[in-house]
Regions:
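A short acidic, Gly/Pro-enriched loop at the edge of an enzyme's catalytic core
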Residues: 137-150
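Conserved beta-strand signature within the Rossmann-like core of class I S-adenosyl-L-methionine
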Residues: 176-184
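A short glycine-rich, Lys/Arg-flanked "PGG" loop and its adjoining helix->strand segment in the class I
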Residues: 164-175
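Class I S-adenosyl-L-methionine
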Residues: 205-239
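Class I SAM-dependent methyltransferase SAM/SAH-binding core
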Residues: 81, 88-138
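N-terminal auxiliary segments of SAM/dcSAM-dependent transferases
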Residues: 1-31
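A short SAM/SAH-binding and catalytic strip from SAM-dependent methyltransferases
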Residues: 147-162
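Conserved alpha-helix/loop element of class I SAM-dependent methyltransferases that forms part
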Residues: 54-76
Length: 239
C-alpha cells in the first residue's frame, strides 16, 4: 500500500477554499473530495489517518467505550449508531471493543461502497441518508434497530451535519443511552446561536442530554502541518 501512494503530495491552502492533495502529476483534488478518495482502496486512510494523523476515530471510540464502562453497560448486548460512518474506521474500533452490533449511516453512497469493499461485516447495516432533514425518513428507519447508543467522529459541524442532524439522531435513542461525538472546536463557541456549542448547552438545559466529559484534543494536522483541535463530547440522553 505504501508503494502505491509514494507519489501523493499534500498541498497547503493556496486560496481560501481549503486543502488539496496531488494524487499524481496530472490530478490534484480537494481534501474533501470524498467520492474520489473513497474510490481507491486505502487512500482515505493513507491521507487522513497516516499523513494528517487524524485521531478522531480513536478518540471517539475510546470515549464511547469508556462511557459504557462508567455506566456499567454491557457492550455485547448493544446496538450502536455510527453517524458519518465513512469507510468504517469507527465501526471497526467499537466492534473491536466488544460492541455487538453497529448500524452505519452516511450521506454518501460512495462511503458505503468503500466500507463494504474494505471492511465487510463491520456493520449490521449501513444506510444512506441525511439526518439534517426533519422531513426525511431516515429517523423512522433507524428506530427499527433498537439502538442503544450513538457515536460520531467529525460528522457534525462545519460543512458536514448541522445541529438539527444531532437533534434528529438523538430522537432515535432511548433515555440513558450513551453517546460520544467529536466536533471541531470552531463550531463549539457558545456565543454563536446557530452553532453546536449553543445547541448542546440548550439540550443540557432541557434535560435532553447529561454531560459526562468534554475534552479538547488534537484532531489532526493540516496539509501544511498546523494543528486542528476538536472537542470530544461524552453524554447520555435524557428522559
Amino acid at each position: 500500500m505504501t508503494a502505491t501512494f509514494d507519489n501523493i503530495r499534500l498541498i497547503g491552502p493556496p486560496t481560501a477554499d481549503g486543502e488539496y492533495v496531488a494524487l499524481s502529476e496530472h490530478e490534484t483534488i480537494h481534501l474533501h473530495d470524498y467520492p474520489r478518495i473513497y474510490a481507491v482502496p486505502g487512500l482515505y486512510e493513507h491521507i487522513v489517518q497516516e499523513r494528517l494523523q487524524c485521531r478522531s476515530p480513536q478518540v471517539a471510540a475510546e470515549g464511547f467505550l469508556r462511557a459504557i464502562t462508567r455506566l456499567a453497560m454491557e457492550p455485547s448486548s448493544m446496538t450502536v449508531l455510527d453517524v458519518g460512518s465513512g469507510t468504517g474506521l469507527v465501526g471497526e474500533l467499537v466492534r473491536g471493543g466488544g460492541v455487538a452490533r453497529v448500524v452505519g449511516v452516511d450521506a454518501l453512497a460512495e462511503a458505503r461502497a468503500a466500507c463494504l469493499r474494505d471492511r465487510p461485516g463491520v456493520y449490521a447495516d449501513y444506510l444512506i441518508g441525511d439526518l439534517s432533514s426533519d422531513s426525511g425518513t431516515l429517523p423512522t428507519q433507524l428506530r427499527g434497530y433498537a439502538l442503544g447508543g450513538l457515536i460520531s467522529a467529525g460528522a457534525f459541524g462545519g460543512t458536514h451535519a448541522p445541529p438539527s442532524a444531532l437533534i434528529n439522531a438523538l430522537s432515535v435513542l432511548p433515555a440513558g443511552a450513551p453517546l460520544a461525538i467529536t466536533i471541531d472546536e470552531r463550531w463549539m463557541d457558545g456565543s454563536d446561536p446557530d452553532g453546536f456549542g449553543a445547541a448542546i448547552e440548550q439540550l443540557v438545559a432541557q434535560g435532553a442530554l447529561t454531560l459526562l466529559e468534554r475534552e479538547r484534543f488534537l484532531h489532526r494536522i493540516t496539509t501544511t502541518g498546523e494543528p486542528i483541535f476538536y472537542e470530544l463530547i461524552l453524554a447520555t440522553t435524557g428522559g
